[in-house]
């Protein structure tokens, strides 16, 4: 997860093995700093329980843990999670590192106050299924944040998958009807070599109405 996506879907071979190899090939593949757009949207939320889906080396998970969140970081790369765990130990942070494939993992129901899906590019129907499960994992009052490369990135952006079938638009990542949309839009952001075009979804599950006295 990064200003350059951590989980642009590899084109062939075992994705988990390919990401293990990529994460093992250098220090940090992605910046140690949190994604700037995500941080700007989440920094004022009260700390609670968070799930970082496709957490990679854990930079968002570590940032949230530093703010007092109880974080579960889920990824299918053993190497990525090991690097995240090492950084957590260095900084005295507590994160639950969970080895699992986002496309099949049980995310629970009403379990989290925040669910992140940053730059995880999957074809349909996998991405729609994932977002449905992420929505179910939200507790009342919880927030879902999804950011990924937009289809327009192929025309006027840099980086990201070059297969349009893996790219986002506002229709593809529109949330289930039981969530309230706070933002659903295309956004441009600075990137190495130019501008990247992303799709952003920020939604919330409404609080339960109080029972009559």
Task: Kindly give the residue locations of the regions a language model identified.
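A short acidic, Gly/Pro-enriched loop at the edge of an enzyme's catalytic core
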Residues: 105-114
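Conserved SAM/SAH-binding beta-strand->alpha-helix loop
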Residues: 77-79
């Amino acid at each position: 997860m990064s200003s350059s996506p951590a989980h642009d879907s590899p084109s062939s071979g075992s994705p988990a093995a390919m990401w293990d190899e990529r994460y093992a090939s250098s220090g940090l593949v992605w910046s140690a700093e949190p994604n700037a757009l995500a941080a700007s949207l989440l920094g004022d939320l009260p700390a609670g329980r968070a799930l970082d889906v496709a957490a990679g080396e854990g930079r968002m998970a570590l940032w949230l843990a530093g703010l007092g969140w109880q974080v579960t970081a889920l990824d299918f790369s053993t190497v990525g999670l090991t690097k995240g765990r090492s950084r957590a130990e260095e900084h005295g942070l507590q994160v639950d590192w969970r080895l699992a494939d986002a496309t099949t993992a049980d995310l629970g129901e009403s379990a989290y106050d925040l669910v992140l899906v940053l730059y995880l590019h999957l074809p349909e129907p996998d991405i729609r299924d994932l977002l449905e499960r992420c929505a179910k994992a939200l507790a009342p009052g919880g927030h879902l944040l999804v950011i990924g490369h937009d289809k327009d990135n192929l025309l006027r952006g840099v980086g990201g998958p070059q297969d349009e079938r893996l790219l986002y638009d506002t229709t593809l990542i529109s949330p289930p009807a039981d969530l309230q949309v706070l933002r659903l839009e295309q956004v441009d952001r600075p990137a190495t070599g130019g501008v990247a075009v992303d799709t952003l979804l920020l939604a919330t599950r409404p609080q339960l109405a109080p029972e009559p006295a």
